[in-house]
Amino acid sequence: MSKNMKRVDFENGTVTGNILGAALPMLVAQILNLLYNIVDRVYIARIPEVGTKALGAVGICFPLIVIITAFANLFGGGGAPLFSISRGKRQEREAVCIMNTSFSMVCVSGVILMVTGVLFARPILILFGASKSALVYAYPYMMIYLLGTLPSMIAVGMNPFINAQGYSVVGMLSVAIGAVANLILDPLFIFVLGFGVRGVAIATILSQTLSAAFVLFFLTGKAELKVRFLRKNEISESTGYAKNIVSLGMAGFIMQLTNSLVTICCNNVLSVTGGDIYISVMTIISSVRQLVETPIHAINEGTSPILSYNYGARRPARVRKSIAVLAVMILIYTGVMWGSIIMIPEVLIRIFSSDKTLMKDAVPALKQYFAAFIFMDLQYMGQTVFKSLNKKKQAIFFSLLRKVFIVVPLTYLMPYVLHMGTDGVFLAEPVSNVIGGSICFITMLCTVMPELKRMEA
């Protein structure tokens, strides 16, 4: 199968063609993956009588779900660029060791997170801002979802190693299997069997299990470089790889964890300044953001293995061209989407809820939140380049800068100190986009480009 299957050749062909060849299947995969969350929210919002309340309650669970995904990406997102760099250097034994180390860490952390989450789900949800009425829906959803932690982490954390070998279509299929299953199972468990919010969680973990099974089937049998769990005598040898994986993956890990931190802070402030209705508004905004960011993530992830491979192969011209193509694609797309958000916000909001009261508050909030969204591109591009080229310190620093040092303080400063109420919560995002995104991108230009020039000498 792997010999006959079409692969993206990261070393040859046009850079634009390679990026599109990797990014388009990833875009389909990202869109399908988005369906896991989007479809869930659409169905939850339409549960008779309790839809809006249940939507807000499940929104409170998102930070914990993001934390689980963050750990999967810590090992997968940290290991895959190192895997690609080793392949570019023609060091395939090292590449396999990196992949096996990542897989072992994904599995061990998955079990630990599941047990911890099940034991402390209720106090965690209360910490995240769940009221007594919200716990009625949030707690059963989270308890069921946590049972699928391990397959969820395998599906997310090991998929990058499929893409890093050039099998982007296979990577897409691994996501498609779960997404299609979720589309079928959601209405069955929610409405036909009458499980309500519990049905959403059951459908999700069953779908994620199917995706994980496909990923393991391919990586253990069909891929060129195969994965397995580390043996006892390999653990000491893998320690160095583990440190490099974690240090490089820490940037994406911090970004996702700080996204959860921001969501927690926003929910806490909104519950005081606006009530439960504004937590539902933030859930809608988060859903819209996931929707419009999906192609951006696909382009970034499609470009990343090409950057890593050619950097390892010492081909600076292809690295530089990849950065330029990445920038053009993302900026054009974001410009179109930003205009759509500002001009027709109602269309995007109606995808998730038709509640008129919610619509009234969500429209101005959405415009405020996305006011400077195009500057976020600068952050994404800089972060992708830093991570792909194994620039750990820069990747980690800029992950912390925008969220921890800018957004979180502003989330409290603007509503309480500047007396801006709920508006302050939503406006904290564009302010951070302008400051954090600009600094990140300028730093990338001033550090990476000179290094590539020296590599040519």
Residue ranges: model-predicted function:
Residues 1-23, 83-148, 194-249, 307-372, ...:
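Short alpha-helical transmembrane segments in multi-pass integral membrane proteins
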Residues 10-50, 63-78, 82, 107-114, ...:
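N-terminal transmembrane alpha-helices
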Residues 21, 44-66, 133-137, 197-198, ...:
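Interfacial/gating helices of multi-pass transporter permease domains
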Residues 21-40, 144, 178, 207-211, ...:
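Transmembrane helical elements of multi-pass membrane transporters/channels
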Residues 27, 31, 35, 39, ...:
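Generic alpha-helical transmembrane segments of integral inner-membrane proteins
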Residues 31, 35-56, 125-132, 188-195, ...:
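Helix-terminus/linker motif at the lipid-water interface of multi-pass membrane proteins
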Residues 55-115, 152-171, 267, 281-339, ...:
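Small-residue-rich hydrophobic transmembrane alpha-helices
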Residues 73-76, 145-163, 171-182, 200-215, ...:
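Short runs within selected transmembrane alpha-helices of multi-pass transporters and secretion channels
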